[in-house]
């Protein structure tokens, strides 16, 4: 599946992630735009089931030397988009990045980075645990190499 994912356009990569959510009984919208006071944010996937909403950012990057730095920036931007969404909808949506390949990190600043091949298993694990706060614990338990180029927070 990873080889197939590499060859598809990014829009189809998003549809694959949306399909996995749909197969797990989520109501899914793709490429949704929300606006408020002239601010505009786009969401690759919004997946809802019961009282749970995921805001999914799909990143189909592979082989980049600066991929880890780019992922960190993507997490920061997606965290801001999630805060915007939560403010205008009064929901408590969960940010999630879906990647093409397994990354050196699995969670950054409480945001899971899940390879598309493991998305179904990730959803099933959430069904068992049903605790979004475990993302932070998951991050704290990780052994992140010292040479990972994460710039300091400002």
Predicted regions and their residues:
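Intrinsically disordered, low-complexity Ser/Thr/Pro/Gly-rich regulatory segments
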Residues: 1-154
